[in-house]
Amino acid sequence: MVFLSSNQTMIQIILGVIIVSIGIFVFYKYPMKSDVRQMTLGALFVILAIILKRLAVMVPFLGFPSLKITLEVLPLIVAGLTLQPGYCFIVSIATDFLGLVLANAGGFPFLGLTLNAVLQTEIPCLLKIYLNEKNERLLERIVKIVMVIISLLGCLYVFKINEVNISGSSYQVTLPIKFTIFVIIAAMLTILFVFIRYYKNKLKEKDLCLFHLSILSVVAIELTVTMFLTPYWLQTMYGIPFFASQFVRILKSCVMIPVGIIIVYTMNRMIQKVIR
């Protein structure tokens, strides 16, 4: 939680309207049906997300201060790929609220972080609904195009910067560091395309669709929440410049995208086998 100034009141109101509007759309467009299995899975996802939120792994990378790697978003993505939209909305709100209660923070909650949680479940859920097995070729093309665009933009951004500020200290981004990051991004993209080709011949149509949805969901969340919304919320709450943390976030995404895809797909496939 953070204490808000009067200048942030309007942002809070706008965020509240957006969250309520998403809830109205979800419950109107996709009416909830009473389902014990969905409720049970939803409760498990909330518990898992809260537990992972309190755990973090510090990873040193290219001589920069350790990157804080957390996995609490992954159960929310899996929830989005597993549950109905209404249950996804409830899971995200419950996770955010209980996380704040357990953190025992004072002040009024910042609704931007609540919106993050909502999007982390609803984006995968809507992707699952609108990009199903009938759009398999389209889904594969979207995955490849999005990954190429993100990789090119990441390389362009890294190429243009020469210095980054992390935790109040300045670090030079030398040519060897830039080259190493380019290689990592290229390797990640190549491995992903190899995996897609490998699984395309090995998996059944439904499992292949699940694999593609896992890729697209993880990438979409990294792009919208991690790379765009979270820096904007930090700028709004604490005055941290939007681009100040982008370099570190690109490094973090190099780790989280492949790890997230593997975990999300594995968890989702296991759950699908159990509930079938």
Question: What feature does the model see in each segment?
Answer:
Residues 1-276:
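Loop-helix junctions at membrane interfaces
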